[in-house]
Amino acid sequence: MKTNNLISGINFIQDCENDIYICYVEEFSEDLKDMIKSMLNSIWHGSVDATERPQFTYNNTIKRFLERYQTKTPDTKKGMIGELLTHLLIPKYINLNAISIMKNKEENSIRKGFDVVYTDENNSLWYCEVKSGGDTNKTEDINKKNLKLLDKAKKDIQEHSLGNRATLWDSVLIDVNSTIFNYETKLDIKKLLDKDHPDTETRNLVRNVILSSVLYKKLDVKICPKNLKNHRDNLVSEKVFLGLILFSIQKETYIKIENFLISQFTKTNYE
């Protein structure tokens, strides 16, 4: 296992050989706040739309995020913050680029379907499912809880990526227009998505997946890398996925990020 302190306040451990990654968010640092400020627009709208559409300002993006966020249950809020953290951290630590956006384009709700879809340096697709939770049961073993989250992610990504809901791919195909600038790359990615599409006669059923867990627990006891590796070994032995990455984030609470986003909206409205 190698450690990496690329972002202050985050102790990052990686086992690249076994595709195991853990972010211990020990402090909601200025680095992480700056990442939210610089990346939220592109995460929410897509980098193309965030660049080309002047109405997609940071303040308006915060506003739209909070419109969806503040009416939700605590569990849904944990999920939204967990998905935001995943969007922020995976591309920072792994050489992957998101081709999907975070916002629900049709309604004032959370995104349906794939949480995030990425491409790697070879333009292979990676389907990511994020599951968050963990701060309600004070006595539950953190490793057991983390593995439960990963198992939930596995169940959902299997259902989504191998299921017949064509709208899931249709949504990502639209997102590609908002996330990729290069025309040729855009066409190549759409062709790959079409191969996985349920309406394709000779549909590809081989998937690269990322199972991401966001565990809200105090860091006096940390997710064990060895447990994560053993869990991945068991999943690999099932031969369900072509490629498999496990990416776990441990943070004490989601509230500090919530308060920061609210303060940013308030601040920009009074400037």
Describe the predicted segments one by one.
Residues 84-93:
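Amphipathic alpha-helical segments that form well-ordered structural scaffolds
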Residues 113-119:
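Short acidic loop-to-beta-strand element that houses the catalytic metal-binding Asp/Glu
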Residues 121-122, 204-205, 212-223, 249-250:
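Short, flexible beta-strand-to-coil junctions
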Residues 1-80, 84:
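Interdomain/boundary linker segments immediately adjacent to catalytic/signaling cores
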Residues 227-271:
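Charge-rich, low-complexity intrinsically disordered segments
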Residues 90, 116, 126-132:
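Conserved catalytic cores of phosphodiester-cleaving nucleases, focusing on short active-site segments
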Residues 132-214:
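Catalytic cores of nucleic-acid endonucleases
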Residues 92-109:
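A short acidic/basic microdomain associated with nuclease active sites
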